[in-house]
């Protein structure tokens, strides 16, 4: 049985992002998402037009990996980075909180995430199933190019 942790993360996240865009109308970027930066440590907004879906898929995978619920502040820290302050030393800055909050609300509306009062959010059985089936599809494609991976199916 293949799970979401046994396939390359970049392949899984891109494939899940495509599925979120095609099959889940609840997950869609707000109008401001194409113009907003993702945090104070960034100079420009993302160049990828589908960055909202990629971030949503990344959040889903983070929730899949975590044994306990994750809150907005944790996601702000995860997606934060070093801020360039000119000649002054760089410092870590958290990412904005609006993007992960809206994405988690949309994933919750789609039934992929469940809210745990006072602790954050965790992945639902439907979200776990989405990631596991996508991981299996990816592994089946990888087996075609690398037959030695067949024992993991």
From Swiss-Prot:
What Pfam families would the database entry show?
Ribosomal_S19e
What keywords were assigned to this record? Answer: Ribonucleoprotein, Ribosomal protein
Q: GO:BP terms for this protein?
A: ribosomal small subunit assembly; translation
What SUPFAM superfamilies does the annotation carry?
Winged helix' DNA-binding domain
Q: Which GO terms describe its molecular function?
A: RNA binding; structural constituent of ribosome
Checking Gene3D superfamilies in the record gives: Winged helix-like DNA-binding domain superfamily/Winged helix DNA-binding domain (1.10.10.10)
SMART domains according to UniProt: Ribosomal_S19e
Would you name any one GO CC term? cytosolic small ribosomal subunit
Listed InterPro entries: Ribosomal_eS19, Ribosomal_eS19_archaeal, Ribosomal_eS19_CS, WH-like_DNA-bd_sf, WH_DNA-bd_sf
* Protein family according to the UniProt entry: Belongs to the eukaryotic ribosomal protein eS19 family.
Q: Which PANTHER family match?
A: 40S RIBOSOMAL PROTEIN S19
Q: How does it assemble?
A: Part of the 30S ribosomal subunit.
Role of this protein: May be involved in maturation of the 30S ribosomal subunit.
What is the name of the protein in this document?
Answer: Small ribosomal subunit protein eS19
């Amino acid at each position: 049985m293949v799970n979401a942790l046994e396939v390359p993360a970049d392949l899984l996240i891109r494939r899940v992002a495509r599925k979120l865009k095609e099959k889940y109308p609840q997950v869609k970027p707000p109008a401001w998402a194409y113009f907003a930066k993702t945090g104070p440590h960034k100079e420009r907004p993302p160049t990828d037009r589908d960055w909202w879906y990629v971030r949503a898929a990344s959040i889903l995978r983070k929730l899949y990996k975590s044994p306990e619920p994750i809150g907005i502040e944790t996601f702000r820290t995860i997606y934060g980075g070093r801020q360039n302050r000119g000649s002054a030393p760089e410092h870590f800055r958290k990412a904005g909180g609006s993007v992960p909050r809206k994405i988690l609300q949309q994933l919750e509306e789609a039934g992929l995430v469940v809210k745990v009062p006072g602790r954050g959010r965790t992945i639902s059985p439907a979200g776990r199933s989405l990631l596991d089936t996508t991981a299996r599809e990816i592994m089946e494609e990888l087996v075609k190019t690398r037959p030695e991976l067949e024992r993991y199916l």
